[in-house]
């Protein structure tokens, strides 16, 4: 299953100490294949992920480990979707 995860930082100052660990978390799950794509919003108030997960329950367990979640300084909205087409230039 594929999920779009919209992450919104609710308190920028409170989030600052968690950002290095959050980036490490993102990279670790990208390297192991859980996260297909991730990036920050240009305005700096969060970002989004495309995640491969077996179920919404396993996705929620994965998201609970995010340092921003542990710091209670961000919110998450998750939406399941089906890929219809994908370009090769996503990183441009």
Language model: regions and residue ranges:
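Conserved, structured core segments of small domains
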Residues: 1-92
